[in-house]
């Protein structure tokens, strides 16, 4: 019986009356899903700008940015307003210097700075040409309970462009200082930090205020390769929209002795910045 293949149209000798294809290859091709043909004239074009404005009207604010004062750092990322940013790194890497450069970039805007480490140098502020009228400093207490109230009041006031908490690892709780050295107060700082974030998160959003939390990197004891962790629990990593890790890559020194200077005098160091979490741009970039 001669029949025509339903796939290729070739005439073939059918052994059965129900045969439709001339070969197994034609049967497989005919059973494969066919691509959907889209009419270019009828295809709907996604209007990005129009839909963006609709989402903003729903109550989702567009991200506004604050410069870090360092062009190379701004090319990686800036600091988002109305959100929480954590800057972490080892000692001496330049976390505080980065925060002070952010303040210098704001110029006439007000900043609330919490110096829980009590290590801020006024000469450095003058070198960066910061205005005392716009720089509100809090270093009256290192207790987390007092610092939390100060952050809460600053966030609710809405008069600050940025609140800088330098640093979370350096603050303590009253239970830690009033007890004995051998007392173990586990999880108190993490509990207070979790509660603080819940209290200020919506105020930061509504007032478009950036909260920058500086944190230290520490190592766990034990094992061949110690794990890196940041004090204060997991509340900040979960709530932060941006997390930046700073790492020293190379120290820069004078190659030769200058007139009246010591040989190989320290000049600075190279810092590598890495985005380890981001809800506002692409993460895991350096």
What are these regions (language model features)?
Residues 34-60, 64-66, 71, 122, ...:
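C-terminal regions of RecA-like/P-loop NTPase motor modules
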Residues 1-35:
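BZIP DNA-binding basic region
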Residues 140-209:
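Phosphate-binding/switch loop-helix module in NTP-utilizing enzymes
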Residues 186-286:
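Phosphate-binding/switch region of NTP-binding enzymes
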Residues 41-136, 152-156:
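The Walker A/P-loop phosphate-binding site
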Residues 120, 171-172, 220:
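Catalytic P-loop NTPase motifs of RecA-like helicase/translocase cores
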Residues 89, 115, 167-169, 248, ...:
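Flexible glycine-/small-residue-rich
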Residues 84-86, 110, 161-164, 210:
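Residue-level preference for the first positions of well-ordered beta-strands
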């Amino acid at each position: 019986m001669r029949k025509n293949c339903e796939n290729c149209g070739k005439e073939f000798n059918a052994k059965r009356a129900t045969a439709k294809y001339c070969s197994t290859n034609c049967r497989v091709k005919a059973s494969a899903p066919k691509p959907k043909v889209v009419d270019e004239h009828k295809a709907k074009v996604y209007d990005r700008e129009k839909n963006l404005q609709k989402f903003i009207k729903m109550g989702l604010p567009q991200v506004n940015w604050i410069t870090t004062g360092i062009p190379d750092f701004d090319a990686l990322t800036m600091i988002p307003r109305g959100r929480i940013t954590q800057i972490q790194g080892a000692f001496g890497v330049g976390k505080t210097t980065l925060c002070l450069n952010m303040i210098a970039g704001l110029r006439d805007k007000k900043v609330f700075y919490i110096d829980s480490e009590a290590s801020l140098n006024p000469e450095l502020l003058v070198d960066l040409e910061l205005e005392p009228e716009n720089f509100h400093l809090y270093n009256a207490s290192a207790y987390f309970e007092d610092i939390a109230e100060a952050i809460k009041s600053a966030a609710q006031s809405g008069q600050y462009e940025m609140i800088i908490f330098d640093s979370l690892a350096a603050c303590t709780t009253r239970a830690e200082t009033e007890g004995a050295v051998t007392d173990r107060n586990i999880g108190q700082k993490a509990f207070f930090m979790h509660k603080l974030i819940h209290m200020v998160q919506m105020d930061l959003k509504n007032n478009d205020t950036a909260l920058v939390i500086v944190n230290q990197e520490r190592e766990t004891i034990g094992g061949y390769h110690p794990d890196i962790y940041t004090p204060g629990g997991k509340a900040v990593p979960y709530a932060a929209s941006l997390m930046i890790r700073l790492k020293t890559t190379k120290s820069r020194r004078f190659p030769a002795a200058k007139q009246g200077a010591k040989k190989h005098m320290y000049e600075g160091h190279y810092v590598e910045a890495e985005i380890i979490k981001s809800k506002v741009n692409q993460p895991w970039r350096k």
